[in-house]
């Protein structure tokens, strides 16, 4: 495990409770049970619903991927202290289980907060999606997010990353980006996203910051859930 991931994992552990209530206005989906999160022992091979992960009472209907891989949907916000750390864990997992899972990223958006979706889809449209990861890491610090969340500063930041400022502004205000923002709002509501990071596995199971702060623990829980879905699909 790299020093960068260790440091970010420690930061995530210290701050994971700070993001627990951030999307209170959004309707939260009902989960099957609720328990307190914990870090299990090394010998733990079974994980408990409501403690290590959550499950939707009614799974989200999803179209099957043509490659048959299980979706891992990562809902994030740039105003998040632990999302970059969680992303590192998820990317690691998707690399070691590339034959089983597909990692998909979705910016969280509400009617009152569209910054993350607007910037994410602007970067995607400019073929600069990798800069989203850079921004997510930078804004792990609240002060940096506060600074960059203003129009002038984020445009200046984009220019510093090598993008054409005027093209960035034009794309940011384009109809296609506006439509993607609306889709993000609808998806945030459909999945009942109420905090960040918020990770949905196969439309059935959910991980939050209470699990996504330790790579060994997170990978073990992800393996447990992916294997669980595979067994359910065989029934």
Curated annotation (Swiss-Prot):
Domain of life, source organism: Bacteria
SUPFAM superfamilies in the record: Thioredoxin-like
Molecular function via GO: protein disulfide isomerase activity; protein-disulfide reductase activity
Alphabetical GO biological process terms: cellular response to antibiotic
Annotated signal peptide: 1-24
Family annotation (InterPro entries): DsbA/DsbL, Thiol_disulfide_DsbA, Thioredoxin-like_sf
Any one cellular-component term (Gene Ontology): outer membrane-bounded periplasmic space
Keywords associated with the record: Signal
CDD domains registered for this protein in UniProt: DsbA_DsbA
Keyword RNA-binding assigned: no
PANTHER family recorded: THIOL:DISULFIDE INTERCHANGE PROTEIN DSBA (PTHR35891:SF2)
Identification of the protein by name: Uncharacterized protein HI_1215
Organism: Haemophilus influenzae (strain ATCC 51907 / DSM 11121 / KW20 / Rd)
Source species taxonomy: Bacteria, Pseudomonadati, Pseudomonadota, Gammaproteobacteria, Pasteurellales
